[in-house]
């Protein structure tokens, strides 16, 4: 990576700050250069957690990375909260990981009340190149994303 490359996205997004209330950058679940760029450019980060066996280790690693980025590249970076995604509430693993997240971070990091369920609707909407609100507007997953949007808007208004 060339020098200063971790600030490339920040310089591209800077002119947009006055035009938009929110700019959302969705990165893949890795700690590669795109994720570091997104963290260097962000005011806040919403950490998504897929309740699988290695989720807690990955969550701890990501929080450490956020702290490093805050110390080295973006001192104003804040954690907006933790969002549980791809959850199947019928499984014990989902329940256990959700409880672990609550026990480990409640009172330290906001845990969003909205929980995004695991469903084929998301993948189908991507396949058909349609926003979820058009492809499956009445679905549970769409309602949870609406709920999350309300939570974020209410949080920003505080």
Predicted regions and their residues:
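Short glycine-rich substrate-engagement loop in P-loop NTPases that contacts/grips substrate
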Residues: 1-9
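Short, flexible helix/strand-to-coil boundary loops that buttress conserved ligand/catalytic motifs
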Residues: 1, 35, 126
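C-terminal alpha-helix
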Residues: 147-158
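Short, glycine-rich, amphipathic interfacial segments at transmembrane boundaries or analogous
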Residues: 118-124
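C-terminal boundary of histidine-terminating zinc-finger modules
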Residues: 125-144
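Short, conserved glycine- and acidic-residue-centered signature motifs
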Residues: 2, 55-58, 141
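Conserved catalytic-core segment of NTP-binding enzymes
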Residues: 8-117
């Amino acid at each position: 990576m060339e020098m200063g490359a971790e600030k490339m996205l920040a310089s591209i997004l800077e002119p947009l700050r006055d035009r938009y209330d929110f700019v959302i950058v969705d990165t893949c679940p890795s700690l590669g250069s795109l994720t570091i760029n997104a963290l260097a450019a962000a005011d806040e980060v919403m950490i998504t957690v897929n309740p699988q066996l290695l989720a807690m280790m990955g969550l701890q690693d990501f929080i450490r990375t956020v702290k490093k980025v805050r110390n080295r590249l973006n001192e104003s970076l804040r954690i907006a909260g933790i969002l549980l995604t791809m959850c199947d509430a019928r499984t014990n693993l989902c329940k256990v990981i959700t409880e672990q997240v609550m026990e480990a971070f409640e009172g330290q990091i906001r845990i969003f009340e909205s929980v995004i369920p695991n469903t084929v609707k998301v993948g189908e909407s991507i396949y058909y190149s349609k926003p979820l609100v058009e492809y499956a507007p009445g679905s549970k997953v769409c309602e949870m994303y609406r709920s999350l949007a309300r939570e974020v808007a209410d949080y920003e208004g505080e």
